[in-house]
Amino acid sequence: DHNGWSDFKGEKRSNDTHQSQTDPEALLYRKGKGREAKLYHSGHALMENRNGLLVALTAGPANGHAERNATCAMIRHVRKRHWFVPATLGEDAGFRGKQHASELAELGVVQHIAGHKGRKPKGWTASQRCRKRIEQIFGWVKEVAGLARTRFIQRWKTKLYLLAAGATYNLLRMKNLGLAA
């Protein structure tokens, strides 16, 4: 047609062939097998298990390796900034991989993967019970803080809003735990 619109039915779409006109940093990403690819930025969080407080939060590109890379980067950041390194890290099955496990081992962190059939390290069951809290954080950030559909163009703006939402979540969590004075 004359205005350049077309449907892409039957055409292969990838980040090489398609780019957002409004936000070039947003990438096509498929959240699961058989699901459609949409433009996303990805948010990553690191939570301590004892109280369910966020320790680190960041936004990055939406691709298959962003979560693994962000995890190690956040652990390094927390170690450098707060002199704190988590002893264990509860992760879902998407984090399974020898390279990621060896990177975590170099950082001194034991990986606890959900649904892992092999030998379970000490504290695995408790770590998996705490994993529900991280999902609650993401649910809160999407529904209450409004990041299910971000209205910000450029990743740094999305990251700033994500950090503000994370700080707000921590304040509410501390209030509910009775830690805030």
Residue ranges and their predicted role:
Residues 1-105, 166-169, 174-175:
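Polybasic low-complexity intrinsically disordered regions
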Residues 49-51, 115, 145:
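Short, small-residue-rich loop/turn micro-motifs
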Residues 53-57, 122, 148-150:
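Short small-residue beta-strand/loop micro-motif enriched in glycine and branched aliphatics
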Residues 92, 106-107, 131, 137:
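C-terminal structured domain segments across diverse proteins
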Residues 96, 118-119:
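Short acidic loop-to-helix transition motifs that present clustered carboxylates
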Residues 107-115:
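Short hydrophobic/aromatic-enriched beta-strand-loop microsegments
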Residues 119-125:
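Short, charged, surface-exposed secondary-structure boundary motifs
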Residues 126-181:
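Basic, amphipathic alpha-helical segments enriched in Lys/Arg and hydrophobic/aromatic residues
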